[in-house]
Amino acid sequence: MVWALPRTSSPSCIAPSYKPDSGWIKMSAEWLIDWSCLLNGLRDLIAGCIQAVRDCNSFALTTVICLLMLFAWYCYRVGKDQPRSPFATVNLLIQSSEAKGLQNGFAYCHSRECVRCTHNDGLNQKLYHNLQEYAKRYSWSGMGRIHKGIREQGRYLNNRPSIQKPEVFFLPDLPTMPYFPRDAQKHDVELLEQNFATILSEFEAIYKAFSNCSLPQGWKVNSTPSGEWFTFYLVNQGVTIPSNCKKCPRTYRLLGNLRTFIGNNVFGNACISVLTPGTVITEHYGPTNIRIRCHLGLRIPGNCELVVGGEPQCWAEGHCLLFDDSFLHTAFHEGSAEEGPRVIFMVDLWHPNVAAAERQALDSIFAPGR
């Protein structure tokens, strides 16, 4: 019996609909070569099985059957691990899975647009494709940690201690701590605190709308086990909200004067966050460790607390509190109704140990809409 792989159609008969990436062509060619070798191995196994039956050699037949079972399992693993096409967008990969509820005791929201709460197995392949595109256009210089982080993302996230486990992207070799000192981003902290009165006055103007309806235009309500948590975004996952910015023009202009505000990728946010009395935010992890989350206290009643990595801290009006939200964290307002809501202005700043070249690359890799 003669074995031969079937002939493929002539290349001239195929009209390509796109020009594929050379890296993907190389990956696909290597995959086809692997399968060609596997088919040759299958041919030899079947031939050995037939010969064993003819010779009535029970030991050889048992051995061949075991090898066939191992071969079938290996084929399943190869097929399962074959990367998906890199031409889908990051947003489609992130949004393709169903929004989650409460998992493993930690909170997930129900928004398909939320970067933290939606995942997809093809995300790392897409991120690597984005990194390759960026490096070809600019340079691989300074990309070592990002390359390492994307390449070994699964191992990093699976092996992280439960106290810190970012949901989407972990950049290796960053100094880590639940809370950061004010000097970590001194310029931006001082600028925010100097503009405390401005931000507070614009909040008070937009918060008056709550007296006329339960959820005024521009506000979002977040899922909590008790109480109510409202947010008013100026920038949501790297996307500016023009209608909201018009209502807080001076606060929005202030963002442009911050040196380390993450405004160009999906990990960057700026919003007013309101907790009503009796509210508890379920403990959860943020999406990445490349940022520092900054809370500027606007209205802080008693019995309000933030807990990050098991360490409690209290906000203070007119002062910034910096923390790494990739640590397990929660917040609550146990004050009375008479005390009113807890209000902070939240803004995401770059981790001080993320280099300028890395920031530029991460803005490209995690750009909104990619």
Swiss-Prot record:
Gene Ontology MF terms in the entry: dioxygenase activity; metal ion binding
A Pfam family the protein falls into: Asp_Arg_Hydrox
Residues holding Fe cation: 284, 329
SUPFAM superfamilies, A to Z: Clavaminate synthase-like
Residue spans, topological domain Cytoplasmic: 1-57
Needed co-factor(s): Fe cation
Binding positions (2-oxoglutarate): 229, 273, 293-295, 342
Lumenal topological segments: 79-370
Topological category with respect to the lipid bilayer: Single-pass type II membrane protein
Transmembrane segments: 58-78
Entry-listed glycosylation sites: 212
E.C. designation(s): 1.14.11.-
Compartmental location: Membrane
Keyword field: Dioxygenase, Glycoprotein, Iron, Membrane, Metal-binding, Oxidoreductase, Signal-anchor, Transmembrane, Transmembrane helix
GO cellular component annotations of the record: membrane
Source taxon at top rank: Eukaryota
Function: May function as 2-oxoglutarate-dependent dioxygenase.
Protein name, UniProt field: Aspartate beta-hydroxylase domain-containing protein 2
Organism: Xenopus tropicalis
